[in-house]
Amino acid sequence: MAATKHSLADSEDRPTKKTKVDSEEKARLKAEKRERKEKKKSQESEPSAENSDADRAAEKERKKAKKAKKLEKKQKLAEAEASAEPAAEVSDEAPKKSKKEKKTTTTEASSNSEAPSSGSYIQTIALSNVPQAEIDEFLSKNEIHITDPKTENVTLRPVLEFHQLPATNLLEKKPSPFANYKAPTPIQSASWPFTLSGRDVIGVAETGSGKTMAFALPCVEAISALKHKHTKAVVVSPTRELAMQTYEQMASVAALNRMKCVCLYGGASKDDQRNLLNRGADIIVATPGRLKDFMSDGTVDLSHSAFAVLDEADRMLDKGFEEDIKMILSSCPPREKRQTLMFTATWPQSVQTLAATFMVSPVKIAIGSGGKETAGGAVELQANARISQSVEVLEPRGKEFRLLEVLKEHQQGSKKNDRILVFCLYKKEATRIENFLSRKGIRVGGIHGDLRQEQRTRSLEAFKSGQTPVLVATDVAARGLDIPEVKLVINVTFPLTIEDYVHRIGRTGRAGKTGQAITFFTVEDKSHSGSLVNILRGANQPVPEDLLKFGTTVKKKAHDMYGAFFKDVDMNAKSTKITFD
């Protein structure tokens, strides 16, 4: 390799090695510069005698003003009966935080941002100006019973009219989410002040009482402040139809705040639902089974969901979803860091236990004549008093032709297109009844578990539109479905439990309107006679003599095929140790 040549100029440009003389010269120049700087500083710091006195006087005045300011702050704190800790916070010279403390504070702030805003509800002047007598009359008339474990005297007033709600981003949207409503329903009126305050709430109310909007409004309001892109809220429903119906209302409210809502249920394409989830879902409305599937494969993550709703909680427990519900709620943030709402038509021990496990000091709001608690803490089951109930005792073989007679009686003249809901106990029975009525010229549709999801949806839409005014259904449609203007409910076969009877007839007489229910009762249903008599009497309905012949004793719920519907144990009792001799 050839050596590289450098010119003389190049060598002169390169730095040379420093000598001892160069270092001493540099130190001397540095010392002289420091000496000149100190001399100049001392000259500037020598004030005249007059200036010195003036400065001292000004300093004294500043100290006096500072002392007076501190004294004034102390007096204000004393008047407000503040504790010593806030007083320390007001101090002018707050101690500096260490890096560790700053990091802890930042972490706490970020974790708090995951929870929905709480305590933001402020009662409006319009609501405060309502006379207490009017509030008491409203609570009494609608039989609203509110129980708050944190206080004996409930101070939050029910919202009687929409304009009495506090102004928020959602409520100020155009068109208003309440454009089609005249006034809040009782469950909405009583629950909104608590849910908008960030409290956990249990709503015990009949079906068709406006429960969906009761939780839709506070849900969207609460999660609007959350800035992360994960799922912020989850609503769990027992059936596909109820999930779809809830989704429609939730999506319309969420869209006002530009939020995305996704509905998950069985019987539909998983791939299509997964694609929707991958595009982002602020709110998920789902049935327990399908939601659990997506959680298991990692598609859905609820660890940031600060708002959870259990709709028709008692029905989900009846259908065996207890473990699924526990898994879903356990996947959400801890109960102290989320807001949980539960809506149910009944208040059995199983629902009470679920609430105690996953909710924090929930406010219980019960609506209706069955709202008062019994000695055991349960809410007595009663039917909607606006529904006219009649029971016909028949021979088992005569039910189909009697059904045909009833339908022809009610589909005359202006009532030709009135919606009539016919309930059967089994899927095969529903198919047989539907085919029988169709052969007799009745415009009829069906909805039960054997049908594909598209068929069920099509039948339901045809019934809602009036295209087929008669719908034959099993109990899958008995709970939660919002089918407006159902004039008549016919129970061809009595359900397995008296609770299901109440929920079936609850399909009519919704939203403050009246309705009618006709029940065919046979000797095969005699074990339910006592419970049915109690329901009829509780709603001031006539009890036929033929029904009384079966007896009025209320028997424990059991079925030859499905077994017992009860437990002879105290669910709250502590376990005991068994000792053998």
From Swiss-Prot:
Belongs to the DEAD box helicase family. DDX5/DBP2 subfamily. This is ATP-dependent RNA helicase DBP3. A motif (DEAD box) lies at residues 311-314. GO terms for molecular function: ATP binding; ATP hydrolysis activity; RNA binding; RNA helicase activity. Residues 7-35, 53-62 have a biased composition (Basic and acidic residues). The Q motif is unique to and characteristic of the DEAD box family of RNA helicases and controls ATP binding and hydrolysis. Keywords: ATP-binding, Helicase, Hydrolase, Nucleotide-binding, Nucleus, Ribosome biogenesis, RNA-binding, rRNA processing. Residues 1-118 are annotated as: Disordered. It comes from the Eukaryota.
